[in-house]
């Protein structure tokens, strides 16, 4: 299923961890698919249009997969509202990050790293929560243009 000009649903449900553990990682509601389509149209497609092809490390996660990868209990990945973007280099990542900060639909923007591997977590909410909980920072650097706390990647 095509979510936007350059993104397919399969890119968001594909998971090496799910495959290895025998987890079926498929969206279980139309709402999740609509959320992914919104994320694509409002955030990821503009990023791709500006910089060319991008790779999604993690998109939709069913609850079992989210638990297996150590995701937070209320992860936006489980609602189809978030994606982790592979960074070809730190310099390109900084360009992605600066561009994503300009997009009004971006809800969370987090620069994360584990060892020498860096990625950007980005989310967008199609249906806005009037009182969103602050996210767990998970050891990564946190930056959201909608919150007062600002850290650079």
What feature does the model see in each segment?
Residues 1-48, 139-153:
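Extracytoplasmic cell-surface/polysaccharide-interacting catalytic and binding patches
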Residues 54, 83, 120:
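A broad, low-specificity signal marking well-ordered, structured residues that form hydrophobic/aromatic
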Residues 69-84:
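Active-site microenvironments of hydrolase-like enzyme catalytic domains
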Residues 79, 87-153:
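Catalytic cores and adjacent binding grooves of peptidoglycan-active enzymes
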Residues 36-43, 65, 81, 92, ...:
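Amphipathic alpha-helical interface surfaces
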Residues 41-70:
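Extended, low-complexity, intrinsically disordered C-terminal regulatory tails
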Residues 61, 76, 122:
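Single, functionally critical "micro-switch" positions that shape active/binding sites
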């Amino acid at each position: 299923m095509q979510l936007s000009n350059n993104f397919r649903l399969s890119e968001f449900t594909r998971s090496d961890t799910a495959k290895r553990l025998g987890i079926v990682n498929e969206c279980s509601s139309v709402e999740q698919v609509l959320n992914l389509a919104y994320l694509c149209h409002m955030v990821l497609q503009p990023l791709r249009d500006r910089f060319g092809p991008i790779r999604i490390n993690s998109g939709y996660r069913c609850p079992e997969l989210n638990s297996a990868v150590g995701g937070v209990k209320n992860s936006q990945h489980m609602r189809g509202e978030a994606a982790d973007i592979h960074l070809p280099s730190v310099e390109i990542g900084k360009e992605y990050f600066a561009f994503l900060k300009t997009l009004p639909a971006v809800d969370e923007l987090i620069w994360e790293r584990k060892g020498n591997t860096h990625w950007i977590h980005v989310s967008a909410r199609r249906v806005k929560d009037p009182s969103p909980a602050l996210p767990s920072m998970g050891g990564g650097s946190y930056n959201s243009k909608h919150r007062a706390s600002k850290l650079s990647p």
